A protein has these predicted regions:
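Conserved adenylation A10 loop of the ANL superfamily
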Residues: 117-118, 277-289, 305
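Conserved AMP-binding/adenylation subdomain of ANL enzymes
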Residues: 298-316, 326-366, 381-382
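Structural core segment of the AMP-binding/adenylate-forming
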Residues: 165, 169-255, 363, 371-372
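AMP-dependent adenylate-forming
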Residues: 35-40, 97-124, 237-239
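Conserved AMP-binding/adenylate-forming core of the ANL superfamily
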Residues: 46-50, 97, 111-165, 182-187, ...
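Conserved pre-ATP/AMP-binding loop-to-beta segment of ANL
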Residues: 107-109, 231-232, 245-279, 286, ...
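Conserved helix-loop-beta element of the AMP-binding
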Residues: 194-198, 215-230, 317, 342, ...
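Gly/Ser/Thr-rich phosphate-binding loop
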Residues: 339, 366-369, 379-436
Length: 436
């Protein structure tokens, strides 16, 4: 017998309006699959069942639906299904940066970057592509080639996105740490990957204070013997002049590294070629390096951003994160769809618990994600989350990092209104994505 308690547990917490469901990315994709594969998939449950029992045609349809920038190659999407050792898209060539920058040239914003001091920088797709092209040319000129590791210690800034895309353009392998980490913690990670280049900031702002990291970066430069190039990035109240030198490597200032007027050249790489290295938590020994490839990341995060998050080109996406959390990697993947990524660098609770919501209102977010602890903290602090502009733009609120409590869920839904989708997710660093 079904009890009232059972019914309450199984009842849907939220359903999209008929209009929102009709214009959603998942509906469009389901109709595309039915049309191109001669299938009858009446709803998303049927689509999900087809996707998990037909891996080869499903992932082939994902490539084709998004018209991925790259060469598909001949043969099946899944050439070898045995694990370990599965082989995906043999013969395909791709580059994450090609998909991300296919939306240039355009005067529309690719990045809106804000910090806790109130500074705001808007970078168009054309400007982003130009900076990436310039830095990639510098990396090539300084001997950085496909397969080299490029390590970075940067905040959640435009420079981090530009550096990552330039690294990917060359076919080098990216690895990033947050500037709040100590030298020992960074070295525990970077020593394992023997980077050839280091891009690091000398200071950063957090909680209303400027934190000098010049001593830490000097330790990294001297301790990473594999380095041949060091690009120093100015922080707040930093004149940007290159001051540190080392006998065993070339040192460049960031502004000099992006000063070239270069054509954008992105190297196509094999589907499985490494894109980035992230790390396990290090609770059992040294943090374990985890490698994800260009092809898998590009297809998976196109799928997640569009079909799971219902993100559209031109919309404004933000997930509060530091560069030490996998959500930084997920956030920048919104560029793959032509969405605008809205970065926030700083303490989300400074000068008060409403700071991040004011940022969301100022830039007019369509998707706003943060950790569950952040949402709970705002609820307890009595924050009014939605300003006038945000009430007209916000469609989805994401949550992760820990379970979102029922109280916090109900608070968000009550404050933001019934049309806003509250969407908690669960995933992992090892897959750079979410599985729930």
């Amino acid at each position: 017998m079904t009890t009232p308690e059972d019914s309450a547990r199984t009842a849907a917490l939220w359903k999209p309006s008929a209009a929102r469901a009709a214009r959603s990315r998942i509906t469009d994709y389901r109709q595309y699959v039915c049309r191109t594969r001669s299938l009858d998939l009446p709803d998303t449950t049927a689509l999900w069942q087809w996707s998990i029992t037909n891996l080869d045609p499903f992932w082939d349809s994902v490539w084709n639906y998004f018209d991925v920038a790259g060469s598909r190659g001949a043969g099946p999407a899944l050439a070898k299904a045995e694990m370990p050792g599965a082989v995906w898209f043999p013969g395909a060539t791709i580059n994450f940066a090609s998909q991300a920058l296919r939306h240039a040239p355009s005067d529309a914003p690719a990045i809106i970057a804000c910090n806790e001091a109130g500074d705001q920088l808007e970078l168009s797709w054309t400007e982003l592509a130009a900076r990436v092209a310039s830095l990639a040319a510098t990396l090539r000129a300084r001997g950085i080639v496909r397969g080299d590791r490029v390590a970075a210690v940067l905040p959640n800034s435009v420079e981090a996105v530009v550096a990552f895309l330039a690294c990917a353009s060359v076919g080098a392998i990216w690895s990033l740490c947050s500037p709040d980490m100590g030298a020992a913690s960074v070295l525990d990670r970077f020593r394992q990957i023997t980077p050839k280049a280091l891009i690091a900031v000398r200071s950063y702002r957090y909680g209303g204070k400027i934190h000098d990291r010049s001593t830490v970066t000097a330790q990294l430069v001297e301790s990473l013997e594999s380095l041949a190039l060091y690009i120093t990035v100015p922080g707040p109240d930093d004149p940007g002049n290159t001051t540190s030198r080392s006998a065993h490597l070339a040192t460049l200032a960031w502004q000099d590294a992006i000063a070239h007027d270069a054509a954008l050249h992105i190297d196509p790489v094999p589907f499985e070629h490494p894109l980035w290295i992230v790390y396990s938590s290090g609770t059992t020994g040294l943090p374990k390096p985890i490698v994800n490839g260009h092809g898998g990341v590009t297809l998976e995060l196109l799928k997640v951003m569009a079909l799971h998050n219902d993100l559209h080109a031109g919309e404004r996406f933000h997930w509060f994160t530091t560069t030490g959390w996998i959500m930084w990697n997920c956030q920048i993947s919104a560029l793959l769809l032509g969405a605008t990524i809205c970065l926030y660098d700083g303490n989300p609770g400074w000068p008060d618990a409403g700071a991040l919501w004011r940022f969301a209102d100022r830039v007019g977010l369509n998707f706003f994600g943060a950790g569950a602890a952040f949402h709970t903290g705002c609820m307890k602090a009595g924050v009014v989350p939605a300003g006038e502009r945000l009430r007209s733009t916000l469609r989805t609120v994401g949550s992760t990092g820990s379970p979102l409590s029922p109280d916090a869920y109900r608070w968000l839904q009550s404050e933001l209104g019934p049309e806003v989708w509250i969407a908690p997710i669960s995933g992992g660093t090892d897959l750079s994505s979410a599985f729930i």
